[in-house]
């Protein structure tokens, strides 16, 4: 028993010793030289670079794509009381492969001390030539001196390319190039550094360019099933509000090669329709989130890679891939109810303008107040068909009000 006690005391003394030789430094971060997911179409490759972080390369159909300025994370921050912004760029400082996904982290601290943590999660759908990104930006600390911010995702071809070496596509806005656009259209001037359009202006939230020589196209799509804004979100003022959850898509043309761009929330420029259109001035309609702890700043994107011999086929394939991504639900409705509600609207808006019966051209929403009558343009071609349905329903249901209103329009216009 005495021997055991002595040994125990010696062990205690050793554990409490001030001998520095027995103190081990905690292990430092371990960085893999290369981390990748996917096997070529596409493949995401991260390579560790001392004093920088992980460089990012995305491969697809023999082409390589890299972030603009080699910075996969880009934040545009607007200081308090200053009209201009400051850009902050960062590489990933941490990366971990978890089965079929890659989790990456970056940190940006502004000059005034605001602290942002960015978490990106990548997954690859190899059989479909797709790379998906889920991004969350957390404001860890707000210094009080930074007012607002936007985050960007921007990638370009690794090889230098002329703007004219590519063909471009944004549904409903740009088809191949600017040659068939009016001077006031978004995308009409490829001398601009930026062509960014809000995604609700598009048939689908998608931007694509195709290299003419390699025939490889890459597209960036927003996988946002619940875009959100509010009624007062209009006009050219720089609006800062945490309730805006929509993006803008397009191209950055001031780099060594054209770049695909996603901006969140969705600022629009260098040409915008927020001013009503009709102007070729370089103007921005900026939308930003507040620099505030707890603000929700998250989105999901998809990069698609195709190789097609002709631009129309590439356009078609990217369109189908994005449409299937959304997979919109076909809702069952009662068409009889739809017809009845429509007739109620016609009955409500029936009016006489200078003794001429008809329906107005437009109304304000959500108030429903009549905005324009304009019998001489636009809706004039539908006065007779609408009156016919109102008149017929009146006869079928013995509704004398419908019959009388429909008859007056038919007598006047026909």
Question: Residue locations for each model-derived region?
Answer:
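Well-ordered alpha-helical scaffold segments within catalytic/enzyme domains
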Residues: 384-400
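Solvent-exposed loop and edge beta-strand segments that line ligand/cofactor-binding
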Residues: 279-286, 365-383, 395
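Beta-strand/loop-rich accessory regions of lumenal/periplasmic or secreted enzymes
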Residues: 37-38, 46-48, 52, 57-293
């Amino acid at each position: 028993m005495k021997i055991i006690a002595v040994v125990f005391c010696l062990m205690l003394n050793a554990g409490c010793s001030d001998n520095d030789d027995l103190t081990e430094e905690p292990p430092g971060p371990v960085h893999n030289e290369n981390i990748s997911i996917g096997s070529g179409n596409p493949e995401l490759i991260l390579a560790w670079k001392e004093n920088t972080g992980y460089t990012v390369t995305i491969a697809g159909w023999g082409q390589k794509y890299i972030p603009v300025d080699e910075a996969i994370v880009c934040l545009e921050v607007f200081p308090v009381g200053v009209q201009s912004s400051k850009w902050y760029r960062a590489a990933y400082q941490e990366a971990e492969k978890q089965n079929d996904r890659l989790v990456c982290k970056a940190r940006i601290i502004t000059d005034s001390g605001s602290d942002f943590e960015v978490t990106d999660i990548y997954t690859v759908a190899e059989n479909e030539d797709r790379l998906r990104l889920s991004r969350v930006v957390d404001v860890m600390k707000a210094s009080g001196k930074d007012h607002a911010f936007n985050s960007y995702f921007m990638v370009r071809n690794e090889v230098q390319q002329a703007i004219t070496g590519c063909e471009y596509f944004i549904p409903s806005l740009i088809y191949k190039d600017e040659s068939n656009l009016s001077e006031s259209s978004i995308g009409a001037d490829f001398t601009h550094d930026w062509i960014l359009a809000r995604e609700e202006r598009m048939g689908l939230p998608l931007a694509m360019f195709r290299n003419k020589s390699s025939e490889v196209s890459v597209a960036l799509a927003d996988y946002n099933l619940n875009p959100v804004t509010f009624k007062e979100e209009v006009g050219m003022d720089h609006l800062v509000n945490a309730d805006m959850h929509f993006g803008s898509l397009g191209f950055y043309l001031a780099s060594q090669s054209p770049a695909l761009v996603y901006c969140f929330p969705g600022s629009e420029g260098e040409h915008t329709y927020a001013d009503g259109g009709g102007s070729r001035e370089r103007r921005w309609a900026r939308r930003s989130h507040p620099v505030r702890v707890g603000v929700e700043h998250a989105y999901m994107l998809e990069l698609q890679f195709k190789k097609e011999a002709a631009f129309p086929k590439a356009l078609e394939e990217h369109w189908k891939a994005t449409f299937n991504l959304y997979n919109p639900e076909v809702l069952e409705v009662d068409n009889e109810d739809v017809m009845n509600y429509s007739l109620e609207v016609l009955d409500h808006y029936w009016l006489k303008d200078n003794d001429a019966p008809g329906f107005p051209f437009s109304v304000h929403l959500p108030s429903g107040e009549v905005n324009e009558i304009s019998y001489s343009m636009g809706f004039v071609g539908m006065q007779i068909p609408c009156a016919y349905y109102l008149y017929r329903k009146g006869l079928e249901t013995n509704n004398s009000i419908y019959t009388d209103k429909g008859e007056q329009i038919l007598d006047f216009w026909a």
